[in-house]
A protein has these predicted regions:
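Short beta-strand/loop segment at the start of cytosolic alpha/beta domains
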Residues: 1-15
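General small-molecule cofactor/ligand-binding pocket signal
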Residues: 4-6, 79, 101
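Residues that form or immediately flank small-molecule/cofactor binding pockets and catalytic motifs
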Residues: 8-10, 83, 105
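Glycine-centered tight turns that cap/initiate beta-strands
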Residues: 10, 94-97, 103
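Active-site donor-binding loop signature of nucleotide-sugar glycosyltransferases
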Residues: 16-18, 103
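Amphipathic alpha-helical interaction surfaces in cytosolic regulatory modules
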Residues: 20-98
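A charged, well-structured terminal subsegment
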Residues: 100-119
């Protein structure tokens, strides 16, 4: 798994690719989020467009990251989850914990509600 980091306004976008599974990504994701939270950067958008698979450990890493960000007044939101991941989040009622955004602009607007975002 690889993670590329970029900043857009007040949020950090993590472009994630590969698999988020036990021993193959979930630890890397937790570490990346933890490091950002230690820097006070708690508004995170995970771009999941290139994520091939997420197992239960990966799902746990997503939920744990979301809860950690909330404790710091931020949030972890998802962009472009696979249909399978979206269905899994829906069936497990985790969409109440992790918001899925339709676009980077929508995510940025949700983090910065008073900012007008060009579409």
């Amino acid at each position: 798994m690889t993670i590329e980091e970029r900043t857009v306004g007040s949020m950090v976008v993590l472009d994630v690719s590969g698999r988020i599974t036990l021993g193959d990504g979930e630890g890397l994701l937790k570490e990346a989020v933890s490091n950002l939270l230690k820097q006070g950067r708690a508004n995170l958008l995970l771009n999941m467009a290139e994520v091939a698979y997420v197992d239960s450990s990966g799902l746990g890493a997503l939920v744990g990251s979301s809860l950690a960000a909330r404790r710091q007044g931020g949030a972890v939101k998802l962009l472009n989850p696979s249909r399978r991941l979206h269905d899994l989040l829906s069936m497990s009622r985790l969409l109440q914990v992790i918001e899925v955004c339709a676009s980077e602009a929508q995510a940025l607007e949700s983090f910065e509600p008073n900012r007008r975002v060009a579409m």
